[in-house]
Amino acid sequence: GSGYSRMFQYERTQSRIGGTLWEKPLQYIENSPLFSADRVQTPLLMMHNDRDGAVPWYQGIEYFVALRRLQKPVWMLTYNGEAHNLRKRQNRKDLTIRMMQFFDHYLKGKPAPVWMTRGIPAIEKGINKGYELSNGNSVKQKNRTQLRNKK
């Protein structure tokens, strides 16, 4: 990030809250997806990159961690050195494959790939893609079991 404060954005521009955090605290809470994380019911595949100039990287991590703590079905893809939109061809191809696998699993009932069921350890990033399909229970089946057990 640039190191500049982003408060002006919320007070005067894109978010249109029209006041400071201290003047309108409820509007800031309502504007933040973090405070609605407990209401997320749809599986989420998010991409947030470390060079994103539009949204601070820590906000993506914060939201991802909140959803994981709430045991929501969420995956976060990070392409190191990339900004808000992907520029490197290999990363665009990787994102396309992962989106297809994600939607094939949740919309067509296909088996989940390894990257969704077991994840990819950081030390294997770029080496082991995890595209192969998992054996055993799918993510969807595990999520259904978790939901049943909560009731």
Residue ranges, per PLM feature:
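Active-site-proximal cap/loop segments of hydrolase catalytic domains
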Residues: G1-K151
